[in-house]
Each structure stands twice: as structure tokens, then as C-alpha cells.
Amino acid sequence: MSVGAHRTAPSAAADSGRWFRRYRATGSVHRRLLVLPHAGGSASFFHAWGTAFDPGTEVLVARYPGRHDRLTDPCVDSMKELADQVTEALLPLLDVPVTLFGHSMGASLAHEVALRLRDRHGVRPAALHVSSRRPPHRLNPKRVHTEGDEALLEEVRRLGGTDEALLTDPDLREIFLPAIRADFTIVGTYGPRRAAPVDCPVYAYVGDQDPDVPVAEMSAWSDVARGAFRLDVLPGGHFYLVDRHDVLVGTVSDRLLADG
């Protein structure tokens, strides 16, 4: 099925508003970029991306349940369930080409969403961008979600990318710890699996000092690409994209325009 031919029920449109923070394009919408955050992350982490692209690009950032705007929604602790729900919420927005960008856990989620769009709905994403995450067949999950609160929070702190106040303030910790544990349950139970290929360009990004994702492992995303594959290595660690924001966004922007 071609992009633009998809039709969905009104309830799916309502789900889109719940699942995505939507930064509307300043001109006519020619393409959409869906950003999928990391474990323990939220849409606000990618707020600067909302206005960083050309006028024809509408940016969507996933709002995972159990935090911020969705604090009262039940957390999701299964990759299958999370990917199913994100895919369904995206269906009303397939009238223009959609590119997927996922960071860390979000990279695995982006890959799963790309597969569901193709296999269940006959839609090929314009491209798949994956950041700071091993490909599916090279995963080595840590089961930190089975440990106590302090061990879990220490892992979050080690990786970075989460507001320190959420980790140290007792009241905030009580509010957000269930969502953090749910995310790390996804990470810890999503083990090695077949490198199911996608029918779109695959672009991979990693920091040269990432403690968990060596460059050689990131390059193995090429096994997922049936077509074009590019790997960009940037200075930094697991959250290189904070200090290298302008470089990364510029590269993603150029590829968005090239791919549709």
C-alpha cells in the first residue's frame, strides 16, 4: 500500500494525540519524522528537535505512558505491546512519508515499528535511523530491572540522559520509578533475535566512547538493511546527541530531504 492511501478509524486518531507530541510544520506537510526516546526518557528530551527541521517536516515525538502528560496511563513493559501501540497510533499519520528515528531502546522500537508498518499495513517507511543501540541479532540485555531500586537508578545514572532530579528527589522518584522500571524491563527482556530486514535506507549513529555499544556492533545494523546503509560515528558517549545536537540534526535533516 502506498503512503497516503491508508484509512483508519476515529479512535486511532485519538490515540495519535495521546501517543505523540506533535510539532506542526510551518508550511505544508511533506514528510513526518517520528522520534522514539530512550529507556527512562520522555518527549521533552527531544523538544529542541521540534523546530529544528525544514518547514515541510512535521516532527512527532513519542510520549510513553506512565510519565509527564501520561502519568496516569499504565506503564508498558513489553516491546511487543509498545511497538503494537505505537504502530496503531501512527496509522492516521501515514498520508505523507514517515521516517523513524530511535535512540537506545527507541532504536529497537523503531525497527519493530518499521516491520509492523510493512508486514501488517503494507507501508514502507522513508528511512530508519537508529542511534546508540546494538542491532537485534547482537543484543546482550542486562536484567537490571530485576534488581532493587538503587541498582536500577544507578544504571540510569550511568547511562545519562535522565534529569538528575528524578533520580534524587524522593517524591519525584516515587512518581517516575515505575516508568523507568517498565522501560528497563523492555530492555532486559528484549533479547537477541533474527536480524529482520527492512525495505528502506538504514542510518546508524553512535558515540565513539559509548560504553555499551562499540562502533563494530553498531555497524552490524547493516545486516538489517536491504538497501542503503550508513554509519556515522560522532565524538561522545551513549548520549553523544546532547553535545553533538547540531551535527546530528543537520545530518538527519539532509537525509530526510533526500529520502522524501
Predicted regions and their residues:
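Domain-scale detector for complete catalytic domains at protein termini or as standalone homologs
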Residues: 1-101, 105-260
